[in-house]
Protein backbone atom coordinates (compact mmCIF):
# COMPACT_ATOMS: atom_id res chain seq x y z
CA UNK A 1 0.00 0.00 0.00
CA UNK A 2 1.48 3.35 -1.07
CA UNK A 3 0.83 6.87 0.20
CA UNK A 4 -1.93 8.09 -2.17
CA UNK A 5 -0.88 10.87 -4.54
CA UNK A 6 -4.16 12.66 -3.87
CA UNK A 7 -3.32 12.98 -0.15
CA UNK A 8 0.28 13.94 -0.87
CA UNK A 9 -1.02 16.82 -2.98
CA UNK A 10 -3.79 17.84 -0.58
CA UNK A 11 -1.54 17.70 2.50
CA UNK A 12 1.41 19.37 0.74
CA UNK A 13 3.75 16.44 1.35
CA UNK A 14 2.85 15.86 4.99
CA UNK A 15 1.53 12.47 6.03
CA UNK A 16 -1.34 13.73 8.14
CA UNK A 17 -4.08 16.32 7.91
CA UNK A 18 -2.25 19.20 9.58
CA UNK A 19 -4.12 22.11 11.17
CA UNK A 20 -1.38 24.51 10.05
CA UNK A 21 -1.95 23.42 6.46
CA UNK A 22 -5.72 23.88 6.81
CA UNK A 23 -5.23 27.41 8.14
CA UNK A 24 -2.78 28.29 5.39
CA UNK A 25 -5.16 27.02 2.71
CA UNK A 26 -8.05 28.91 4.31
CA UNK A 27 -6.32 32.25 4.90
CA UNK A 28 -3.52 32.04 2.27
CA UNK A 29 -0.85 32.77 4.86
CA UNK A 30 0.45 31.43 8.15
CA UNK A 31 -1.98 31.95 11.05
CA UNK A 32 -0.85 31.94 14.68
CA UNK A 33 -2.81 31.20 17.83
CA UNK A 34 -2.67 33.58 20.77
CA UNK A 35 -3.59 31.85 24.03
CA UNK A 36 -5.84 33.80 26.38
CA UNK A 37 -6.48 33.39 30.10
CA UNK A 38 -9.48 35.05 31.73
CA UNK A 39 -11.16 34.89 35.12
CA UNK A 40 -12.94 31.60 34.50
CA UNK A 41 -12.88 28.46 36.62
CA UNK A 42 -14.15 24.89 36.20
CA UNK A 43 -17.13 23.08 37.75
CA UNK A 44 -14.80 20.40 39.13
CA UNK A 45 -12.88 23.15 40.93
CA UNK A 46 -15.60 25.33 42.38
CA UNK A 47 -17.66 22.51 43.88
CA UNK A 48 -20.48 22.33 41.36
CA UNK A 49 -19.53 18.77 40.36
CA UNK A 50 -16.28 18.27 42.29
CA UNK A 51 -13.38 20.10 43.92
CA UNK A 52 -9.67 20.13 43.23
CA UNK A 53 -9.89 20.04 39.44
CA UNK A 54 -8.40 17.36 37.18
CA UNK A 55 -5.55 15.50 38.85
CA UNK A 56 -3.13 16.38 36.02
CA UNK A 57 -4.06 20.04 35.68
CA UNK A 58 -2.07 23.09 36.64
CA UNK A 59 -3.27 25.94 34.46
CA UNK A 60 0.19 27.48 34.55
CA UNK A 61 1.03 24.81 31.96
CA UNK A 62 -0.96 26.64 29.29
CA UNK A 63 -0.71 30.19 30.54
CA UNK A 64 1.58 32.54 28.58
CA UNK A 65 4.87 33.04 30.39
CA UNK A 66 4.39 36.81 30.27
CA UNK A 67 0.75 36.66 31.42
CA UNK A 68 -0.38 39.60 33.55
CA UNK A 69 -3.17 38.79 36.04
CA UNK A 70 -6.51 40.39 35.18
CA UNK A 71 -5.23 41.65 31.83
CA UNK A 72 -8.05 42.30 29.38
CA UNK A 73 -8.60 40.32 26.20
CA UNK A 74 -7.24 43.25 24.19
CA UNK A 75 -4.16 43.62 26.38
CA UNK A 76 -3.35 39.91 26.10
CA UNK A 77 -3.84 39.97 22.34
CA UNK A 78 -1.62 43.04 22.02
CA UNK A 79 1.12 41.31 23.97
CA UNK A 80 0.83 38.06 22.05
CA UNK A 81 0.59 39.71 18.64
CA UNK A 82 3.62 41.89 19.35
CA UNK A 83 5.74 38.88 20.25
CA UNK A 84 4.59 36.84 17.24
CA UNK A 85 5.06 39.75 14.86
CA UNK A 86 8.58 40.38 16.11
CA UNK A 87 9.49 36.69 15.93
CA UNK A 88 7.64 35.54 12.82
CA UNK A 89 6.35 38.71 11.14
CA UNK A 90 2.87 37.33 11.85
CA UNK A 91 -0.15 39.21 10.54
CA UNK A 92 -3.09 36.87 11.18
CA UNK A 93 -4.17 35.35 14.47
CA UNK A 94 -6.71 33.09 16.09
CA UNK A 95 -7.77 34.20 19.56
CA UNK A 96 -7.58 31.02 21.63
CA UNK A 97 -9.69 31.03 24.80
CA UNK A 98 -7.58 28.34 26.40
CA UNK A 99 -7.28 28.24 30.19
CA UNK A 100 -9.95 26.77 32.43
CA UNK A 101 -13.52 26.42 31.06
CA UNK A 102 -14.23 29.21 28.59
CA UNK A 103 -18.01 28.81 28.43
CA UNK A 104 -18.53 28.62 32.20
CA UNK A 105 -20.03 32.07 32.76
CA UNK A 106 -23.05 34.20 31.92
CA UNK A 107 -23.65 34.34 28.14
CA UNK A 108 -23.56 38.15 28.08
CA UNK A 109 -20.13 38.21 29.71
CA UNK A 110 -18.87 35.51 27.37
CA UNK A 111 -20.13 37.39 24.33
CA UNK A 112 -18.31 40.53 25.48
CA UNK A 113 -15.01 38.64 25.68
CA UNK A 114 -15.48 36.84 22.36
CA UNK A 115 -16.43 40.00 20.48
CA UNK A 116 -13.59 41.96 22.04
CA UNK A 117 -11.23 39.37 20.58
CA UNK A 118 -12.83 39.58 17.15
CA UNK A 119 -12.43 43.36 17.16
CA UNK A 120 -8.66 43.08 17.55
CA UNK A 121 -6.70 43.86 14.35
CA UNK A 122 -5.47 40.72 12.62
CA UNK A 123 -7.74 38.28 14.45
CA UNK A 124 -9.34 36.07 11.80
CA UNK A 125 -11.05 33.55 14.04
CA UNK A 126 -11.74 32.10 17.47
CA UNK A 127 -10.94 28.84 19.23
CA UNK A 128 -12.97 28.24 22.37
CA UNK A 129 -11.85 25.47 24.73
CA UNK A 130 -14.39 24.08 27.16
CA UNK A 131 -15.80 21.02 28.88
CA UNK A 132 -18.62 18.99 27.33
CA UNK A 133 -20.81 19.56 30.40
CA UNK A 134 -20.54 23.35 30.17
CA UNK A 135 -22.46 24.08 26.98
CA UNK A 136 -25.94 25.26 27.93
CA UNK A 137 -28.22 26.05 25.01
CA UNK A 138 -27.82 29.83 25.34
CA UNK A 139 -24.03 29.59 25.15
CA UNK A 140 -24.11 27.11 22.29
CA UNK A 141 -26.46 29.40 20.37
CA UNK A 142 -24.10 32.33 21.00
CA UNK A 143 -21.13 30.37 19.69
CA UNK A 144 -23.13 29.20 16.67
CA UNK A 145 -24.06 32.82 15.89
CA UNK A 146 -20.39 33.83 16.08
CA UNK A 147 -19.43 30.93 13.82
CA UNK A 148 -21.63 32.45 11.11
CA UNK A 149 -19.52 35.61 11.32
CA UNK A 150 -16.00 34.23 11.70
CA UNK A 151 -13.81 31.16 11.48
CA UNK A 152 -14.40 29.24 14.71
CA UNK A 153 -13.45 25.99 16.41
CA UNK A 154 -15.15 24.61 19.50
CA UNK A 155 -12.58 22.57 21.42
CA UNK A 156 -14.01 19.94 23.77
CA UNK A 157 -11.83 18.48 26.51
CA UNK A 158 -12.77 14.81 26.63
CA UNK A 159 -9.29 13.41 27.47
CA UNK A 160 -10.42 9.75 27.53
CA UNK A 161 -13.30 7.80 26.01
CA UNK A 162 -13.44 5.56 29.09
CA UNK A 163 -15.62 6.57 32.03
CA UNK A 164 -13.46 4.71 34.52
CA UNK A 165 -10.54 6.96 33.54
CA UNK A 166 -12.64 10.13 33.61
CA UNK A 167 -13.68 9.26 37.14
CA UNK A 168 -10.11 8.51 38.22
CA UNK A 169 -8.80 11.86 36.96
CA UNK A 170 -11.70 13.74 38.62
CA UNK A 171 -13.12 15.18 35.41
CA UNK A 172 -16.60 15.38 36.91
CA UNK A 173 -18.31 14.40 33.64
CA UNK A 174 -18.75 11.22 31.65
CA UNK A 175 -18.72 10.14 28.04
CA UNK A 176 -22.48 10.64 27.87
CA UNK A 177 -21.95 14.40 28.43
CA UNK A 178 -19.47 14.48 25.58
CA UNK A 179 -21.79 12.65 23.20
CA UNK A 180 -24.57 15.08 24.04
CA UNK A 181 -22.29 18.10 23.50
CA UNK A 182 -21.05 16.82 20.14
CA UNK A 183 -24.56 16.07 18.92
CA UNK A 184 -25.85 19.53 19.87
CA UNK A 185 -22.76 21.28 18.47
CA UNK A 186 -23.07 19.43 15.15
CA UNK A 187 -26.76 20.36 15.02
CA UNK A 188 -25.45 23.94 14.93
CA UNK A 189 -22.90 23.04 12.20
CA UNK A 190 -19.98 23.87 14.48
CA UNK A 191 -16.45 22.62 13.90
CA UNK A 192 -15.62 20.36 16.85
CA UNK A 193 -12.07 19.51 17.92
CA UNK A 194 -11.65 16.94 20.71
CA UNK A 195 -8.74 16.78 23.15
CA UNK A 196 -7.42 13.31 24.00
CA UNK A 197 -4.66 12.35 26.44
CA UNK A 198 -2.72 9.17 25.71
CA UNK A 199 -1.02 7.30 28.55
CA UNK A 200 -3.40 7.22 31.50
CA UNK A 201 -2.75 4.40 33.99
CA UNK A 202 -5.21 1.55 33.61
CA UNK A 203 -5.69 2.05 29.88
CA UNK A 204 -4.25 -0.54 27.53
CA UNK A 205 -2.91 0.27 24.08
CA UNK A 206 -6.18 -1.01 22.60
CA UNK A 207 -8.16 1.20 25.00
CA UNK A 208 -6.34 4.26 23.69
CA UNK A 209 -6.48 3.30 20.03
CA UNK A 210 -10.24 2.68 20.32
CA UNK A 211 -10.68 6.46 20.42
CA UNK A 212 -9.79 6.81 16.72
CA UNK A 213 -12.70 4.74 15.31
CA UNK A 214 -14.93 6.22 17.99
CA UNK A 215 -14.19 9.73 16.70
CA UNK A 216 -14.63 8.52 13.12
CA UNK A 217 -18.14 7.32 13.89
CA UNK A 218 -19.07 10.56 15.62
CA UNK A 219 -17.92 12.67 12.69
CA UNK A 220 -15.88 15.18 14.68
CA UNK A 221 -13.78 17.63 12.69
CA UNK A 222 -10.50 17.78 14.60
CA UNK A 223 -8.45 16.11 17.30
CA UNK A 224 -5.68 17.22 19.64
CA UNK A 225 -3.44 14.49 21.02
CA UNK A 226 -1.51 15.00 24.24
CA UNK A 227 0.99 12.66 25.84
CA UNK A 228 0.38 12.30 29.57
CA UNK A 229 2.97 14.46 31.30
CA UNK A 230 3.39 15.32 34.96
CA UNK A 231 3.21 18.94 36.07
CA UNK A 232 4.36 20.37 39.39
CA UNK A 233 1.81 20.96 42.13
CA UNK A 234 -0.74 18.44 40.86
CA UNK A 235 -2.25 15.30 42.35
CA UNK A 236 -0.71 13.40 39.45
CA UNK A 237 2.73 14.51 40.63
CA UNK A 238 2.08 12.85 43.99
CA UNK A 239 1.05 9.61 42.28
CA UNK A 240 4.11 9.79 40.05
CA UNK A 241 6.46 10.29 43.00
CA UNK A 242 4.87 7.24 44.65
CA UNK A 243 5.68 5.17 41.57
CA UNK A 244 2.01 4.76 40.63
CA UNK A 245 2.27 6.38 37.18
CA UNK A 246 4.42 5.14 34.31
CA UNK A 247 5.01 7.43 31.34
CA UNK A 248 5.77 6.70 27.71
CA UNK A 249 9.26 7.05 26.35
CA UNK A 250 9.36 9.24 23.27
CA UNK A 251 9.74 6.24 20.97
CA UNK A 252 6.78 4.48 22.60
CA UNK A 253 4.62 7.56 22.25
CA UNK A 254 5.62 8.15 18.63
CA UNK A 255 4.68 4.58 17.70
CA UNK A 256 1.32 4.93 19.46
CA UNK A 257 0.53 8.21 17.69
CA UNK A 258 1.24 6.68 14.30
CA UNK A 259 -0.92 3.64 15.11
CA UNK A 260 -3.67 6.09 16.11
CA UNK A 261 -3.32 8.17 12.95
CA UNK A 262 -3.47 5.07 10.77
CA UNK A 263 -6.97 4.36 12.12
CA UNK A 264 -8.17 7.97 11.95
CA UNK A 265 -10.40 9.25 9.16
CA UNK A 266 -8.10 11.33 6.91
CA UNK A 267 -10.74 14.07 6.87
CA UNK A 268 -10.26 14.76 10.59
CA UNK A 269 -7.83 17.64 11.16
CA UNK A 270 -4.89 16.89 13.47
CA UNK A 271 -4.56 20.08 15.51
CA UNK A 272 -1.77 18.70 17.69
CA UNK A 273 0.14 15.43 18.02
CA UNK A 274 1.86 15.93 21.38
CA UNK A 275 1.58 18.13 24.44
CA UNK A 276 4.08 20.00 26.58
CA UNK A 277 4.26 22.44 29.45
CA UNK A 278 6.87 25.02 30.38
CA UNK A 279 10.17 23.40 31.31
CA UNK A 280 10.09 25.12 34.71
CA UNK A 281 6.95 23.28 35.82
CA UNK A 282 7.42 19.95 34.03
CA UNK A 283 8.28 17.00 36.27
CA UNK A 284 8.33 14.29 33.58
CA UNK A 285 8.93 13.12 30.93
CA UNK A 286 11.89 15.29 30.03
CA UNK A 287 11.47 14.66 26.31
CA UNK A 288 8.04 16.32 26.28
CA UNK A 289 9.45 19.83 26.71
CA UNK A 290 11.24 19.49 23.36
CA UNK A 291 8.14 20.05 21.24
CA UNK A 292 10.01 20.35 17.98
CA UNK A 293 11.98 17.20 18.71
CA UNK A 294 8.79 15.25 19.43
CA UNK A 295 7.12 16.48 16.26
CA UNK A 296 10.18 15.73 14.13
CA UNK A 297 10.33 12.22 15.59
CA UNK A 298 6.71 11.65 14.55
CA UNK A 299 7.35 13.01 11.04
CA UNK A 300 10.44 10.81 10.58
CA UNK A 301 8.68 7.71 11.91
CA UNK A 302 5.78 8.24 9.51
CA UNK A 303 8.29 8.28 6.66
CA UNK A 304 10.22 5.28 7.98
CA UNK A 305 7.06 3.21 8.38
CA UNK A 306 5.68 4.48 5.06
CA UNK A 307 2.56 5.41 6.99
CA UNK A 308 -0.04 8.17 6.92
CA UNK A 309 -3.28 9.27 8.55
CA UNK A 310 -6.07 6.95 7.48
CA UNK A 311 -3.81 4.21 6.11
CA UNK A 312 -6.07 1.56 7.64
CA UNK A 313 -9.29 3.56 7.52
CA UNK A 314 -11.97 2.30 7.34
CA UNK A 315 -11.08 -1.42 7.29
CA UNK A 316 -9.20 -1.89 10.57
CA UNK A 317 -10.87 1.12 12.17
CA UNK A 318 -14.30 -0.42 11.64
CA UNK A 319 -13.17 -3.59 13.40
CA UNK A 320 -11.81 -1.78 16.47
CA UNK A 321 -13.70 -2.14 19.76
CA UNK A 322 -16.07 0.52 21.04
CA UNK A 323 -15.24 2.23 24.36
CA UNK A 324 -15.98 0.29 27.52
CA UNK A 325 -18.81 2.45 28.82
CA UNK A 326 -22.57 2.13 28.83
CA UNK A 327 -24.09 -0.51 26.55
CA UNK A 328 -26.58 1.93 25.07
CA UNK A 329 -23.78 4.36 24.22
CA UNK A 330 -21.90 1.62 22.40
CA UNK A 331 -25.04 0.93 20.39
CA UNK A 332 -25.50 4.61 19.62
CA UNK A 333 -22.18 4.94 17.83
CA UNK A 334 -22.19 1.72 15.79
Residue ranges and their predicted role:
Residues 54, 116-123, 210-224, 294-309:
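Structural recognition of alpha->loop->beta junctions
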Residues 1-32, 222, 230-334:
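Auxiliary Fe-S-binding modules of radical SAM enzymes
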Residues 32-36, 93-95, 126-128, 152-156, ...:
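Hydrophobic faces of well-ordered beta-strands that scaffold small-molecule active sites
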Amino acid sequence: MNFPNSLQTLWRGKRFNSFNRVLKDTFHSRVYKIGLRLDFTCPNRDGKVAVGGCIYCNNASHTPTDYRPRASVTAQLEQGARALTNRHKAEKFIAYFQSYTNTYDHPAKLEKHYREALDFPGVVGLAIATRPDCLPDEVLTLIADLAKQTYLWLELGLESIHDRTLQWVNRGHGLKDYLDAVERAKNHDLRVCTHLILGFPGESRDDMLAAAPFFNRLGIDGVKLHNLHVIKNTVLEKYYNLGQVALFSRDEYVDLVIDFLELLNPGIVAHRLSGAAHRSITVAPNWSVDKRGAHNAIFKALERRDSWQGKYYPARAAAAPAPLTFDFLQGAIL
